[in-house]
């Protein structure tokens, strides 16, 4: 089940706070129809029971469209519902422990801001890295900035795929060209839009150009 580089091309990371009256299910489905290649459920403010219910619904949706479904941080839930994988940050469970819990066949993504963190995550069994924030972001107030030079250095230092995250939108994707990334992870540039399908389609086209 390990992810291929192409699965990371346009990585949708959910945040229901941007949705207004729309349901997360419909927004995620529209984003997949628009070209999202992988989905991460990241809902920090949901109660456990509601998060679990949402996770199962989005998991079924992703199965229907043959898109990998990952859960942010909640390793126990990811194991319980047999999600395709889990993504953890530097302040979550240590990557090596996560790998032991989820087993060798599930996808493990790890956030990194430095070469040291990136190499450590790779050694611990990460399948890909999420590196950022590469641009100012309104989604995570505490996100440390990562320069494009650092992003490039991390891509050169590791053997696993790297996804850029943080403040990515149509107007800045092409500035990531030549960095070595294999895709971008996007939150508000898809899920804050009235038409997530059109937003994803536009981002997909630009991302394909940026990683050539």
Task: Put a short name on every predicted segment.
Residues 1-93, 100-127, 143-146, 153, ...:
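Conserved N-terminal beta1-alpha1 strand-loop-helix module at the mouth
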Residues 41, 88, 131, 136, ...:
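Short beta-strand and adjacent tight-turn residues that come in two discontinuous sequence segments
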Residues 93-94, 137:
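A short, polar/charged loop-to-alpha-helix boundary motif
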Residues 131, 163-168, 184-188:
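Glycine-rich beta-strand-to-loop/alpha-helix junction loops that act as flexible
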Residues 136-144:
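Phosphate-binding beta-alpha-beta segment of Rossmann-like dinucleotide-binding domains, i.e.
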Residues 179-183:
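Internal alpha/beta core interface subdomains
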């Amino acid at each position: 089940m390990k992810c291929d580089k192409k699965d990371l091309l346009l990585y949708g990371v959910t945040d229901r706070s941007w949705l207004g009256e729309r349901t997360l299910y419909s927004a995620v489905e529209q984003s997949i129809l628009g070209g999202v290649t992988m989905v991460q459920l990241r809902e920090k403010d949901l109660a456990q029971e509601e998060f679990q219910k949402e996770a199962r619904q989005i998991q079924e949706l992703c199965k229907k469209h043959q898109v990998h479904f990952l859960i942010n941080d909640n390793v126990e839930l990811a194991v319980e519902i047999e999600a395709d994988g889990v993504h953890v940050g530097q302040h979550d469970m240590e990557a090596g422990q996560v790998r032991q819990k989820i087993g060798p066949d599930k996808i493990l993504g790890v956030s990194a801001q430095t070469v040291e963190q990136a190499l450590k995550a790779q050694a611990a069994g990460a399948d890909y890295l999420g590196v950022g924030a590469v641009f100012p972001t309104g989604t995570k107030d505490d996100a440390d900035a990562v320069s494009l030079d650092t992003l490039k250095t991390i891509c050169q230092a590791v053997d696993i795929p790297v996804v850029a995250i943080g403040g990515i939108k149509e107007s800045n994707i092409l500035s990531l060209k030549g960095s070595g990334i294999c895709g971008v992870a996007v939150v508000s540039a898809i899920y804050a839009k009235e038409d997530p399908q059109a937003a994803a389609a536009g981002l997909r086209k630009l991302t394909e150009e940026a990683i050539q």
